[in-house]
């Protein structure tokens, strides 16, 4: 029994491992370029079967805990390996030994508590390494990165356990584009640990406390170009004179991101910034100012000099006691050299006139996403305010009047670029006043319904996209770029009103087509973006867009954004791929051709009818059909005559003087029906013929040259033939009065030809001795 249980357990383990391996393989997908993706696939290990074809492997967000020496052994061409957010706690020493081509390695947010330099020694091509978020306390016992001579981006540290930076940690690294250190809980920093790196383009430093900030600053000031401080509480920061006497600082940009600061500590920070002689740009993102703007300091503290700072950026600044905030007048003197200021989404509603006047060098001012209205803007743009200002951005504020906004800015003599997008203007007056040097105006997303002469004619660039415009008819002689996407325009603007236009972006409007003539009318146009419209793919439009090879150079969004909206059977297809049928593209020519063909057919039919007596046949058929449609007076036939005699009027003498005498004077006499004698006067002749034939037992045809020339004889012959067909009897008797060659019989007498081929006929003898026999045979035929 125990043996059986043991076998069952072994089989269960084998099956479980088999299923796990199968699941691992199913969770990994690779394309033909060797890019393999297996993120978030619940993998418990690195899939087996990986070969040298794999160039990129993403196994992030799985449950991998262990990497063995054999897992990646065959991946000799692997260039990128992403193992972030797994549960990796162990990596064998030679796990990466075959990855000499690896350039990107991400081991962040795992459970690696000890780092080994043996992992990284084979990675001679590595340019990116991320070790963030692992619970190690230090960066190993020996230098981890000394062999990574090509490393450009390095990210190390964690929020909780990384407490110590040692001098050996970054030994061997001479140049880095980016170095990110999460030293949120840093407690020990060995002097000159970061000084070994000769040049770092961008250093990102996470520090909760500022205790070791000055020491680190001393080491990096001569090697870092951009220093970024994150998640730091500087409320109690105090600057102390540095013992180094550094004068060759390389720092050009200092960024504070998610930093807490007070009125007093801000002054201390500015003292620190005074040590950076080459500082050009200062940035505060998502910071909190726990103060009221009381920056008044003692005489001993007046050592602040903004130096060469040209750019100041403040985004999403939070001031809890905003309602108590001061007027910043103590800082006015520090702003005279600043050229670029951005204060975005920080609840700014006013720039005091005095501050505006102190900003003498300011060329660029961005006050986007604030609370500015026309009345306060007028105070900000007072006389002598912003004398050098060229670009003013007031995007997404509370401006409501274009006329007032333009008048307010008249004091800014050098202003050339104005962005007042995402304000709610709704309407536009007929005329406005603007600074006379205006070149650029952005009115996108302002809910305007029309454009008027309020737009300055000096503009070179105009953006009115994402509004409710259905017409653009402004004369802007100097305009070079027009952005008018996401409106309701149904056609391109008039080119004669925009003679200098180089760029036109008019996508996502209501345009259905445009022609070569329209585009050619824009003589200077270099770039057109017209995708996203509902194009009617007519033959003319398709021919123009598909045959003009140079069009692709002008249409920057061609062909992906040019889709047909109609005809319905090509809706959604790219314009360049649509092909219409000949009938759709040449309808006029096709109809004309069909009309010509129909005319020729009618003409040919007429000629054939004339040549082969078609009209005569039609008349005869019509008469027959009319006669057949008439109701019969009695269900049974009333035979009144022994024979109806069909003959030509020119053969009347033979019929009346010979035939009638022989048959009607015979005993018993035969009763014959002759048209001259027995037709009812006033009755339609066709009806007389039909009635006489139907009331006669037989029909006698007196054939001669005269007979075949008679139209009425032809009728009588045809009606007799129809009767023969309808009643299936032998009612026709042919008398050949004179010899007739069948070739001489006209084609329209096809019935006569057929009867002569199938029936025996009586021939009138020229010898009088034989005539008695002729009459005997005729009488016998009539009686039969």
From Swiss-Prot:
Q: How is it modified after translation?
A: Ubiquitinated at Lys-754 by PPP1R11, leading to its degradation. Deubiquitinated by USP2.
- The short motif ATG16L1-binding motif is annotated over 761-778
| Keywords per UniProt | Cytoplasmic vesicle, Disulfide bond, Glycoprotein, Immunity, Inflammatory response, Innate immunity, Isopeptide bond, Leucine-rich repeat, Membrane, NAD, Receptor, Repeat, Signal, Transmembrane, Transmembrane helix, Ubl conjugation
One Pfam family matching this protein: LRR_1
Domain LRRCT: residue ranges: 525-579
Q: Report the sequence similarity comment from the record.
A: Belongs to the Toll-like receptor family.
> What is this protein's function per UniProt?
Cooperates with LY96 to mediate the innate immune response to bacterial lipoproteins and other microbial cell wall components. Cooperates with TLR1 or TLR6 to mediate the innate immune response to bacterial lipoproteins or lipopeptides. Acts via MYD88 and TRAF6, leading to NF-kappa-B activation, cytokine secretion and the inflammatory response. May also promote apoptosis in response to lipoproteins.
By what name is this protein known?
A: Toll-like receptor 2
In its UniProt entry, the species of origin is given as Pan paniscus (Pygmy chimpanzee)
Q: Gene encoding this polypeptide?
A: TLR2
């Amino acid at each position: 029994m125990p043996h059986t249980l043991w076998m069952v357990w072994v089989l269960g383990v084998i099956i479980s491992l088999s299923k796990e391996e199968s699941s691992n393989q199913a969770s990994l997908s690779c394309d033909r370029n060797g890019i393999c993706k297996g993120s978030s696939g619940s993998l418990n290990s690195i899939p087996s079967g990986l070969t040298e074809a794999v160039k990129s492997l993403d196994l992030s967000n799985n449950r991998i805990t262990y990497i063995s020496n054999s897992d990646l052994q065959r991946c000799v061409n692997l260039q990128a390996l992403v193992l972030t957010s797994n549960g990796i706690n162990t990596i064998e020493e030679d796990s990466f030994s075959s990855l000499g081509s690896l350039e990107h390695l991400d081991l962040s947010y795992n459970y690696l508590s000890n780092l080994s330099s043996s992992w990284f020694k084979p990675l001679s091509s590595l340019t990116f390494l991320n070790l963030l978020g692992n619970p190690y306390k230090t960066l190993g016992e020996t230098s981890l990165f000394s062999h990574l001579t090509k490393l450009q981006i390095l990210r190390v540290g964690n929020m909780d356990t990384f407490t110590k930076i040692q001098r050996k940690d970054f030994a061997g690294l001479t140049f880095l584009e980016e170095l990110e250190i999460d030293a949120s809980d840093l407690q020990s920093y060995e002097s000159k640990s970061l000084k070994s790196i000769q040049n770092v383009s961008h250093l990102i430093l996470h520090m909760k406390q500022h205790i070791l900030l000055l020491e680190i600053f001393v080491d990096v000031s001569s090697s870092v170009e951009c220093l970024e401080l994150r998640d730091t509480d500087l409320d109690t920061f105090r600057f102390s004179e540095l013992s180094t006497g550094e004068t060759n600082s390389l720092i050009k940009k200092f960024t504070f991101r998610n930093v807490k600061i007070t009125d007093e500590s801000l002054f201390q920070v500015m003292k620190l910034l005074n040590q950076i002689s080459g500082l050009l740009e200062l940035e505060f993102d998502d910071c909190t100012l726990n103060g009221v703007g009381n920056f008044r300091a003692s005489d001993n503290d007046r050592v602040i000099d903004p130096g060469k700072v040209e750019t100041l950026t403040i985004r999403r600044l939070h001031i809890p006691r905003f309602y108590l905030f001061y007027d910043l007048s103590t800082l006015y003197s520090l702003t005279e050299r600043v050229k670029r200021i951005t204060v975005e989404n920080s609840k700014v509603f006013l720039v005091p006139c005095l501050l505006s006047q102190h900003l003498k060098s300011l060329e660029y001012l961005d006050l986007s996403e604030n609370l500015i209205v026309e009345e306060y803007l007028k105070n900000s743009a007072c006389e002598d305010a912003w004398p050098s200002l060229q670009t003013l951005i007031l995007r997404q504020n509370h401006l409501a009047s274009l006329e007032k906004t333009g008048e307010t800015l008249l004091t800014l003599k050098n202003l050339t670029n104005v962005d007042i997008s995402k304000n709610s203007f709704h309407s536009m007056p007929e005329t406005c006043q603007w600074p006379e040097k205006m070149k650029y105006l952005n009115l996108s997303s302002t809910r305007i319904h029309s454009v008027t002469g309020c737009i300055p004619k000096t503009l070179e660039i105009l953006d009115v996209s994402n509004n409710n415009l259905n017409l653009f008819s402004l004369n802007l002689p100097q305009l070079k770029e027009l952005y008018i996407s996401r409106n309701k325009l149904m056609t391109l603007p008039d080119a004669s009103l925009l003679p200098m236009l180089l760029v036109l972006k008019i996508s996502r409007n209501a345009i259905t087509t445009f022609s070569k003539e329209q585009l050619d009318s824009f003589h200077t146009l270099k770039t057109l973006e017209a995708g996203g419209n509902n194009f009617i793919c007519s033959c003319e439009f398709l021919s123009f867009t598909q045959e003009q090879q140079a069009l692709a150079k002008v249409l920057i969004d061609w062909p992906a954004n040019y889709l047909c909206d109609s005809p319905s059977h090509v809706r959604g297809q790219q314009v360049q791929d649509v092909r219409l049928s000949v009938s759709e593209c040449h309808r006029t020519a096709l109809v004309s051709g069909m009309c010509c063909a129909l005319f020729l057919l009618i003409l040919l039919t007429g000629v054939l009818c004339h040549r082969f007596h078609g009209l005569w046949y039609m008349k005869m058929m019509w008469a027959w059909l009319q006669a057949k449609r008439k109701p019969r007076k009695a269900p049974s036939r009333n035979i009144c005559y022994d024979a109806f005699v069909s003959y030509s009027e020119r053969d009347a003498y033979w019929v009346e003087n010979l035939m009638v005498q022989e048959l009607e004077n015979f005993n018993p006499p035969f009763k014959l029906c002759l048209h001259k004698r027995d037709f009812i006067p006033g009755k339609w002749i066709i009806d007389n013929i039909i009635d006489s034939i139907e009331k006669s037992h037989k029909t006698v045809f007196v054939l001669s040259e005269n007979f075949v020339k008679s139209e009425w004889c032809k009728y009588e012959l045809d009606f007799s033939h129809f009767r023969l067909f309808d009643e299936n009897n032998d009612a026709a008797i042919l008398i050949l009065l004179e010899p007739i060659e069948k070739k001489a019989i006209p084609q329209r007498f096809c019935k006569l030809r057929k009867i002569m081929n199938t029936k025996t006929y009586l021939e009138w003898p020229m010898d009088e001795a034989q005539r008695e026999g002729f009459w005997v045979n005729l009488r016998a035929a009539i009686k039969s």
